[in-house]
């Protein structure tokens, strides 16, 4: 769990920025959003398949775009 120590003379904005950076690195917010509602194994697999297809299509698009420049 992220946590910071506020130093003397630290402004609130600076401490908040450091805390926010730590939470972003540890994926706390995204994990909370993912666990907000129960998700069955089949739903997880379905989402993984969809994301895998998106990655493949993105790679193909980038590859074709790169090849067209040659």
From Swiss-Prot:
Classification via InterPro entries: Ribosomal_bS21, Ribosomal_bS21_CS, Ribosomal_bS21_sf
GO biological process: translation
GO cellular component: ribonucleoprotein complex; ribosome
Key word Oxidoreductase present: no
A GO term, aspect molecular function: structural constituent of ribosome
Domain of life: Bacteria
Annotated keywords: Ribonucleoprotein, Ribosomal protein
Family the entry assigns: Belongs to the bacterial ribosomal protein bS21 family.
NCBIfam families, per the entry: S21p
Protein name per UniProt: Small ribosomal subunit protein bS21
Originating species: Helicobacter pylori (strain G27)
């Amino acid at each position: 769990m992220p946590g910071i120590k506020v130093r003397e003379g630290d402004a609130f904005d600076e401490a908040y920025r450091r805390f926010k950076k730590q939470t972003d690195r540890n994926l706390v917010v995204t994990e909370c959003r993912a666990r907000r509602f129960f998700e069955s194994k089949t739903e997880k697999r379905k989402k993984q398949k969809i994301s895998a297809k998106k990655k493949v299509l993105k790679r193909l698009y980038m590859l074709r775009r790169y090849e067209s420049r040659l």
